[in-house]
Structures are given as C-alpha cells and as structure tokens.
Amino acid sequence: WSRQAFEKEFNLDYSYRFVLEEEGEIIGYAVVWQIYDEATIMSIAIKKDRWGKGYGKRLMKFLIEYFKGKVSRFVLDVRRSNIRAIRLYQSIGFKIISERRGYYSDGEDAFQMTLELEENGGDKGKAFEAVNTGG
C-alpha cells in the first residue's frame, strides 16, 4: 500500500490497524475493516526477514481473538501465487470460496478466502489464544 492509502485508513470509522512489534521494532502489520458482522483483512504483512518464524500465524490468531464475538466471519483476498500465505490461512481454517480473475493491478488472479466463526464468537473446530503483539 502507498503512504497515502495508509493515511486514508485513519479516517475510516470501520478500519482497524494493528502493528506487530518485537523489542521495539515493527515487524508486521494488519489493516482490517469491520462492516457489520464481517471482518475483511484488507492488508497484512510481515517483514521478509521474519518469514517462516511464526509471526504471520501469531498475528492472524491475534486478529481472530480480537474480533471474537464481534464478527461471524473473516474474509480476505490473496494472490494466487502466494502459496506461503494460502497455506498459512488454510492451517488456521480459512477456505477458498472463489477465484477473482485479473484482480490485481498486474493482472494476477486472487483467491477469496473465508473463515466462518460460530455464533458465540469462537471459530469452528479451532482453539485460539490472544498473543501479545509488543511492548
């Protein structure tokens, strides 16, 4: 995302921004829109030198815990070529529900994925705990 896009997020009532930091260093972030009972992960990233160390999973679990009881499902779009992210999302319980042809500006397709939560705010068949994202 561009700096301008991030700055615009701060003016949206339905936009939530999260930062994952370790020892004062920002190593990841997420932007989530909550509209009614649905949380859409608009953007999520972990610094490349931290890939494969569980930070993405920790951040995703934190998001699910944070929105428990507030939403009935999560939705996200992911590049078809981003196998690492797709596997992460599937390991947490996300399912591919559709393919969006030419979704990205470079023409790449996207998968739309969802995680359905139970009415009590829990997810179906998985147990998550909150994680400390810094400080």
Descriptions of predicted regions:
Residues 84, 121-122:
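Residue-level signal for secondary-structure boundary sites
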Residues 75-77, 90, 95-111, 133:
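Conserved catalytic-core motifs of GNAT/GCN5-like acyltransferases
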Residues 37, 48, 76-86, 102-107:
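Conserved beta-strand-loop-alpha-helix junction that forms the acyl-donor binding cleft
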Residues 67-77:
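Conserved GNAT acetyl-CoA-binding A-motif
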Residues 43-61, 79-87, 91-92:
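Conserved glycine-rich acetyl-CoA-binding loop
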Residues 1-51, 60-67, 98, 116-121, ...:
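Acetyl-CoA-dependent GNAT
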